[in-house]
Amino acid sequence: MKLLEGKKALIFGVANNRSIAWAVAQVFKNAGAEVGVSYAGEILRRRVEPLAESIGCDFVEECDVSKDEDINAVADKAKEYFGKIDILVHSIGFADRSELRGPFYNTSRAGFHLAMDISVYSFIGLARAFQPLMNEGGAMVTMTYHGSTKVTPNYNVMGIAKAALEASTRYLAFDFGKEKIRVNAISAGPIRTLAAMGVGDFKTMYKAFEDMAPLHENVTTEDVANAALFLCSDMSARTTGEILYVDSGYNIMGVPEAVPE
């Protein structure tokens, strides 16, 4: 029997074929789940619909997660289509490019609010809207990054947002524990996604990660999707409120390994 046989999963944040959310959708489908996906905006629709069709995914909905009415509308459609769901994946993060370069203290008030709303509150809003639809024993997963706990030049306000997202994960895990629903986060290494390309000097960060991580390998979207599969399957039935690092061990390092002269 496949790990997600008979499970119903809804995945938010598919943008293109390089998205972490898209990798999750593929892995979950291959693991036996019935999958639905959501995207943001008309431009992305043209990219996402063909991807969804390629794996036989019929539930494809647009959702502006900055609007509660959009979130609630997708929840209503999901209830009509699925009845109940077992898995909710939140793979959404955004900050204006202008906020992801230069000193952090130059973060604008509007930029701070935007990053927190899209990257953090959206997870809370989705959890609240889908709570009535979640089966007992279900799972919610979000995506974070090491910049939540360690300074990452140019990551700036997104680091603050990811720290808040991780705290939100723990509070949601407490709230949903009474319903036997698990809530966890995955902290992946840098990946060449659409969102990552907005971070200033990302190429340097990407190379430095590979050099410093104990495994000396960058992370792929499939690596992250496989971790999500574990967290959303019964294999992790007693795991909640955790931040699972999928980063080739980068998070354990204090200083880079000395390079022989």
Please provide the spans of the model-predicted regions.
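C-terminal helical subdomain
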Residues: 121, 185, 204-239, 244-248
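Hydrophobic structural elements of the Rossmann-like NAD(P)H-binding subdomain
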Residues: 11, 89, 141, 183-186, ...
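A short hydrophobic alpha-helix cap/turn motif
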Residues: 29, 83, 134-135, 174-179, ...
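Canonical Rossmann dinucleotide-binding motif of NAD(H)/NADP(H)-dependent dehydrogenases/reductases
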Residues: 2-38
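Short-chain dehydrogenase/reductase
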Residues: 75, 123, 127, 169-170, ...
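Conserved mid-core segment of classical short-chain dehydrogenase/reductases
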Residues: 52, 63, 67-72, 76-81, ...
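A glycine/serine/threonine-rich, flexible loop-to-helix segment
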Residues: 49, 178, 188-213, 253-261
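Catalytic loop of short-chain dehydrogenase/reductase
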Residues: 13-20, 93-128, 136-178, 190-192, ...
